[in-house]
């Protein structure tokens, strides 16, 4: 079986195909749309049309804009940050578009503005957001973990505001490398996007992946970045937020111990914490989350994206561990940072 970047490709893509990982190439002249992996012709609408499921990540590439001084995008009010593509000889741009797990299904507009000297060129693309069939999980927890009193509710709201403010101050430059890695080896115990019914009460969908592992297991940074927050929150427990630049964040929750401080620079594969069961958790596991310009996306989607090496970095891309198979699921953790 052929392996790519340390990952069993057949094994990995069988899992990732659920999220239709795609790469959209927007050419400045004819505007064709291509998919990664290629799934056949795509209907056109506006300058072009493509579809993506809730929770997926899209690579947007704009080649051959030799005179462009900046290229910016917008999708559902969120920024689509594009930057010079090192593999295009300095003439192209590349960036990430995240589709949030709760984005409204249906057609939405992606706009791209390219500054060409004193002129701005406007491109418009139709993105069809496809509804994902997320699982439903019924969980039984201690009452005080679900029904918060007034004091606990005030704490939770303050913690949410702390995170909101911190994540609004993203690094203006790309810090991450071409290859993301899984932060801990273990079994998937909680599925991204699952609808959670806690003690009979509907709660927010699960915005990450839970990976079960023994207490104290090393937790690694998924990629290069700067530690933006180290917290101890009511639901997520001890947690670390890593800013990878240009609106891309990774989150690591329920840690027994955090081994980094706010402001620290970290490298992919660096141990930043230990698996624990702090916050709202039923057993030791890591809640691993990702956000792309505010969109909550499946973290496993980042493992196979066709991104070029960051020429500003000085380290080789580390091999990513294989993605766990579906049959390894075992409900041992709760995870999450919301109600």
Identify the residue ranges that each predicted region occupies:
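Bacterial N-terminal signal peptides
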Residues: 21-31
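N-terminal edge beta-strand
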Residues: 36-55
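Surface-exposed, glycine-biased beta-strand/turn segments
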Residues: 45-47, 124-236, 325-339
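Aromatic/hydrophobic beta-strand junction motif of beta-rich domains
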Residues: 57-65
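Ligand-binding face of N-terminal immunoglobulin V-set domains in extracellular IgSF glycoproteins
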Residues: 94-99, 106-109
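Conserved structural position at the C-terminal beta-strand
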Residues: 112-114
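Catalytic cores of peptidoglycan-degrading enzymes
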Residues: 181-321
